[in-house]
Amino acid sequence: MKFLVILTLCIAGAIAHCDKAPFIKASWNQVKHNEVDILYTVFKAYPEIQDRFPQFAGKDLEAIKETAEFAVHSTRIVSFMSEIVSLVGNPAVQSSIDLLLVKMANDHKARGVTKELFEKFNIAFMGYLKSHTTWDKKTENAWKVVGDEHHAIVYSILE
C-alpha cells in the first residue's frame, strides 16, 4: 500500500515538475559520457559500494579504473541514468520511469543492496554532478525535487 501511495504522488509530481526537466537534462548532458569517472568517484568515496560488485570487490580501484570491465559496467549504470533523464519531464511516460525504478530497486534488493548504500551512491553522484557541471540553485532544486520523487520509489522497495 505504501508503494502505491508513493507511486501516485510521484505521478502527480511529474506533472507539477515539468519545468525541472530542462535543468536536469542540461546538467546531465555535460557529464553523461563520463561513465568511468562517475563510477570511480562513487567507489572512491564509498569503498563499501565497490565491495558490493563481485567483479570489483577487494581490488585496487586505481588498477581496475582503466580496465574494459570497469568501463563496461560504468556504461551500464550511466546508460540507465541516461534513460531515466531522457524521460523526465514528460508526464505521458512517468509510468515508464516508475517501472524502470521499481525493476532496478527489486534487482538490487535481491542482491542485498540497502537503502543506506543507495543514499551513499546518491551523495557521491550528486557531488560529482555539482563539481563537473554548470550548477546553480535552479539546477540543484530540479535534481533535488525530481530525485526525491525517484528515491521515494526506490526506498519504498529497499526498506
Swiss-Prot record:
Q: Which Pfam families does this UniProt record tie to the protein?
A: Globin
* Name of the protein described by the UniProt record: Globin CTT-W
Q: Where is the signal peptide?
A: 1-16
Query: Do you know which Gene3D superfamilies this protein is assigned to?
Result: Globins (1.10.490.10)
Give the binding site residues for heme b: 73, 108
Q: Which UniProt keywords apply?
A: Heme, Iron, Metal-binding, Oxygen transport, Signal, Transport
Give the originating organism.
Chironomus thummi thummi (Midge)
| The keyword Metal-binding is assigned to this record | yes
Q: Name one GO cellular component term.
A: hemoglobin complex
Q: Which PROSITE patterns match?
A: GLOBIN
* Assigned protein family: Belongs to the globin family.
